[in-house]
Amino acid sequence: MESVELTLKNSNMKDKTLTGGAQNGDDFSVDDLLDFSKEEEDDDVLVEDEAELKVQRKRGVSDENTLHRSNDFSTADFHTSGLSVPMDDIAELEWLSNFVDDSSFTPYSAPTNKPVWLTGNRRHLVQPVKEETCFKSQHPAVKTRPKRARTGVRVWSHGSQSLTDSSSSSTTSSSSSPRPSSPLWLASGQFLDEPMTKTQKKKKVWKNAGQTQTQTQTQTRQCGHCGVQKTPQWRAGPLGAKTLCNACGVRYKSGRLLPEYRPACSPTFSSELHSNHHSKVIEMRRKKETSDGAEETGLNQPVQTVQVVSSF
């Protein structure tokens, strides 16, 4: 209500000023301009109005706070009224709480010795806890059975004399040397001699086979007809497989291999007696046959005996 009254007063003052101005406009004079008393009164009225407005605002804020507080108290009263508990139960709960507090209370004594990690003295190292494995080995350790030493000399049927000599020397040295009585030595040292000899024999057999192969490869193979040692392919001849060179083998297969034929690369080639052309070989054979026939005819002619006539 007070705020409404203030607004009405302000509106009245504005109306008065407007009407006064209109009237003074009619009766306008210099004296009215120089009269400042009315303006001072108007300023005082405005200051008073502003102070009243500030006071009313403060009162409105305080009223709102009181309303909020009253609402909070009313809600709290409502909740407490909804959770009403009889006095006997409250007394029993208090008795139980006091009993529990008395029974659980134990005087706490402060520790006199500080731990190592607080004092900084780390000379004494913490030993780690050894954790035992929960899974134990199911297979127990098995002891090796001791075996009797073999005194006899083992001779291989396909071995050489040097191997038997080495095995006999090894057995004599082992018999002369003192043997420990541990079964592990018997199982590991004594019975490993035989596999070693086997491996040595295998190595020697492989070496012998390799030597024979290299010997056969290094042997100088030559043609049985012309004596050639290098040829792209070895062929079969009258002496067996791979006994003739490629050229001689081809002519032997076709039936044209003659003694007068020699390839040009043959070490026994001579231009007077041999040729690598079949036609020339035939001519040479004809000439030879004619010369041989002439010689035979000359030898077969009868020798004329000269009869010496005695003169009288």
Curated annotation (Swiss-Prot):
Annotated Low complexity bias: 157-186
Swiss-Prot/TrEMBL GO biological process terms: positive regulation of DNA-templated transcription; response to light stimulus
Motif Nuclear localization signal, residue range(s) on this chain: 143-150
GO molecular function: DNA-binding transcription factor activity; sequence-specific DNA binding; zinc ion binding
Compositional bias per record (Basic residues), positions renumbered to this chain: 142-151
InterPro entries per record: GATA_TF (IPR051140), TF_GATA_pln (IPR016679), Znf_GATA (IPR000679), Znf_NHR/GATA (IPR013088)
Name of the protein described by the UniProt record: GATA transcription factor 6
Family that this chain belongs to: Belongs to the type IV zinc-finger family. Class A subfamily.
Keywords of this entry: Activator, DNA-binding, Metal-binding, Nucleus, Transcription, Transcription regulation, Zinc, Zinc-finger
Function per UniProt: Transcriptional activator that specifically binds 5'-GATA-3' or 5'-GAT-3' motifs within gene promoters. May be involved in the regulation of some light-responsive genes.
Lineage, highest ranks first: Eukaryota, Viridiplantae, Streptophyta, Embryophyta, Tracheophyta
Basic and acidic residues bias (residue ranges): 56-71
UniProt region (Disordered), positions on chain: 1-33, 56-77, 136-186
A GO CC term assigned to this protein in UniProt: nucleus
Species of the source: Arabidopsis thaliana
ZnF endpoints (GATA-type): 217-271
Cellular localisation: Nucleus
